[in-house]
Amino acid sequence: MLGDGKEGTSTIPGFNQIQFEGFYRFIDQGLIEELSKFPKIEDIDHEIEFQLFVETYQLVEPLIKERDAVYESLTYSSELYVSAGLIWKTSRNMQEQRIFIGNIPLMNSLGTSIVNGIYRIVINQILQSPGIYYQSELDHNGISVYTGTIISDWGGRLELEIDKKARIWARVSRKQKISILVLSSAMGSNLREILENVCYPEIFLSFLTDKEKKKIGSKENAILEFYKQFSCVGGDPIFSESLCKELQKKFFHQRCELGRIGRRNINWRLNLNIPQNNIFLLPRDILAAADHLIGMKFGMGTLDDMNHLKNKRIRSVADLLQDQLGLALARLENVVKGTIGGAIRHKLIPTPQNLVTSTPLTTTYESFFGLHPLSQVLDRTNPLTQIVHGRKLSYLGPGGLTGRTANFRIRDIHPSHYGRICPIDTSEGINVGLIGSLSIHARIGDWGSLESPFYELFEKSKKARIRMLFLSPSQDEYYMIAAGNSLALNRGIQEEQAVPARYRQEFLTIAWEEVHLRSILPFQYFSIGASLIPFIEHNDANRALMSSNMQRQAVPLSRSEKCIVGTGLERQVALDSGVPAIAEHEGKILYTDTEKIILSGNGDTFSIPLIMYQRSNKNTCMHQKPQVRRGKYIKKGQILADGAATVGGELSLGKNILVAYMPWEGYNFEDAVLISESLVYDDIYTSFHIRKYEIQTHVTTQGPERITKEIPHLEGRLLRNLDKNGIVMLGSWVETGDILVGKLTPQVAKESSYAPEDRLLRAILGIQVSTSKETCLKLPIGGRGRVIDVRWVQKKGGSSYNPEKIRVYISQKREIKVGDKVAGRHGNKGIISKILPRQDMPYLQDGRPVDMVFNPLGVPSRMNVGQIFECSLGLAGSLLDRHYRIAPFDERYEQEASRKLVFSELYQASKQTANPWVFEPEYPGKSRIFDGRTGDPFEQPVIIGKPYILKLIHQVDDKIHGRSSGHYALVTQQPLRGRSKQGGQRVGEMEVWALEGFGVAHILQEMLTYKSDHIRARQEVLATTIIGGTIPKPEDAPESFRLLVRELRSLALELNHFLVSEKNFQINRKAV
């Protein structure tokens, strides 16, 4: 247990701290550990020895800046230098040099790495902790079978099981098992040592037959017996050194290496005191495990819960980077061995610098960041997304589970998750429960366990808080912990009452005097996403989960706005995301514009560059706007510029808009949403999106490709935006089909394509006439916009054959439109169904038209009542010009606290603004509103308010797609699937039934033949459309039916067709 040193106070830790601590642990400890494991390498004749001197390693500061690495597609990394020595044993001379081993990608201030110009982040993984676990299962006779499973550091498993006769077996494979005596003897123990080190020697002697004695008569016999069972080898193998090495490699290395965490866990579980540096399984461990298993058989001891967090460990970024460094150094060892051997064979004098190459380390890390499942591209949709991505916990990945094999018990919430893993925030779909999110205060301990903070209370008074303790999952089981809805913030309230508490994974109600620990904050069990939901205690957990996920999909708007109703975490999320520019020094502002801010302080001048229209990997716009004026004095930590989706240093993902909950002509049926045209014309929900288009130039066999403006056979209007070099000009407005970069690729024309004069020139002068085809970069469908940046990228120091890249960045301004998706913070999502003129929208008693109409039926069945509280409190806040920051579980102060707060604020707003309709006692929170089309009041009063509504990244411009004709699949001859492949619409079984129900036979036949997979009918339709005339009726079967016939034929089933008639049936009418 660790305290933070300050008594009775706590601060929310930095949200990126998990990533920073992991990388620091790798640089500070893991790097030295792996380098110190690098062995001394000798040649075959043992004359030359190569070794590394770890104490003098050095990491060099990168030469490029982060922003340049992104634009030039480079890796932001540090060069690793180590001193190496080459010793000649005969002359006892040593040559020492400082050598370059490779590049290690660095972590930036966002907790991410930049690899090949792409922001990447490493996800923390939850694995079964190495150690021993005892479980019980019922066999087919209903008898309990006890097993002990030893899990190695590599994830390998060795199972011990006890049968009806109390004999203990070690299962070495799915089908083969050997006696525990044979395994112990093969590991180096004799029978006398075995019997001396067990608690039940009589049980071990009971199954010691003469045959068994012969097997364990010597270590060699035991190893041979073990090898026969493990490798399933028949006959009598001969004992040899190679046989021992094979066993060592295939069995002992994979299943018996415990690591320091496994050694600690086994010592604790079996009450052993073996030193921590013994990281391999010993015979003493096997015998102690067998003793414990016998005790389980006779009812002593407790079984293990495999899903408890004390039996899990976190594989952080430090562990993953250290594993990759070990792998790279193993490859480097092989390279050095080969180079030394080659130098001696060719009688060359090697030097340390010639022996070592940087390729193994550099390529290992680049492949890790590029290919490893736990290394992901950073999601930069908005500031919240960036932070939450780095705090994910995954059961998936190498050594973990898969979405197909994980059972429900693993996915479910466990009591040990309390305060460590958020019970709400997880992914939806096949990975539900397998990808979680860290709670706000959780941290990773030294042994890979998740720790959560609690306040320790005085023994007598239980009134004051002494200090904050961080407890691991194995420690907090032994304490009575007051649950989160107890009074964690208010000391003045009487606490001598019964309180809900947690003890040994059970939730109890106990007297306050019995409480040992209490939680420190009401939302310490939630993740960041869930903690941003106001009134979350009034929502169903499924809807809170959807809200946590949808807030990460919110698009930064062109004019953001703070939420009226929040939880108080918005500021820290914005600051830790790195999106706003924050002053690192105090001083005076000398100059400010959209590109930079110049600050003078302590005699120095600092220039702070601002981000201007930078593209995120989700095509959203990252932009910083200065918030300070020239001549103003600022302090360290003050906000200089707001970023995307931040206002005044607070997270601002959406807008506070006027909403009514009422049906309107069926346009908000099934979660559809009706909006006013003012949201479009006033740019309320307008966002900017930046797309990147890229083209490369290569050197072909016919010559190099050329970037040029002179493109033959193309209309001039398509080339109107190109400059003299053939690249689109900055600031140009481009439409679909326009040329962004003109490029010609050389090719040799066929003889038949030459004109007569070309053939004459070739015959007389022998001139080879070359032609070129245009391979220009054209703007695809839906890409219209303004060109804001053009970059010509070529890697330095490369040959002329290196491809040049030209990148064009185009900005799009997107207003909200029909088909876009919007959502609140309570899982209330919907699609825009209609945009009404503002004069037709329902309006309030003060004449204001509402901006959005939601369906009231979306509330009771979804049980997300929090949106109603937020809606009404938002209205009161807008009238009183107040902002509210409400922590969850406010019912800990009194019953119905949320409802009382909302009603009191509405009442105050009604009095202050002299608008009695704001709070009407007959139906509080509701108001009578009027139909904009007729001016008549609606029959029932309606809930109106100002909730915080987000615009999500699922936009109709990215989804809508149409095609007349296009590509067809080769096998089925049906249209391809998806917008990216210019695919067609699928008419499945249910669609066919719907058309059959309406009796539209001809339309159905068109869809299943002409428009799908009837090859000849497709061609005839095209011909008749051009020439004119009637479309012929298809007579033969479509291609998919022919495919079915061929598949049946491959199964030796021939399908024939014939005309059905009475003659074929041979019906006997008299018999009928």
UniProtKB/Swiss-Prot annotation:
Listed Pfam families: RNA_pol_Rpb2_2 (PF04561), RNA_pol_Rpb2_3 (PF04565), RNA_pol_Rpb2_6 (PF00562), RNA_pol_Rpb2_7 (PF04560)
GO BP, sorted A to Z: DNA-templated transcription
GO cellular component terms, A-Z: chloroplast; DNA-directed RNA polymerase complex; mitochondrion
EC number: 2.7.7.6
Keywords: Chloroplast, DNA-directed RNA polymerase, Nucleotidyltransferase, Plastid, Transcription, Transferase
One annotated GO molecular function: DNA-directed RNA polymerase activity
Keyword Nuclease: no
General function of this protein: DNA-dependent RNA polymerase catalyzes the transcription of DNA into RNA using the four ribonucleoside triphosphates as substrates.
Annotated family: Belongs to the RNA polymerase beta chain family.
Name this polypeptide is given: DNA-directed RNA polymerase subunit beta
Organism: Lobularia maritima
Gene behind the chain: rpoB
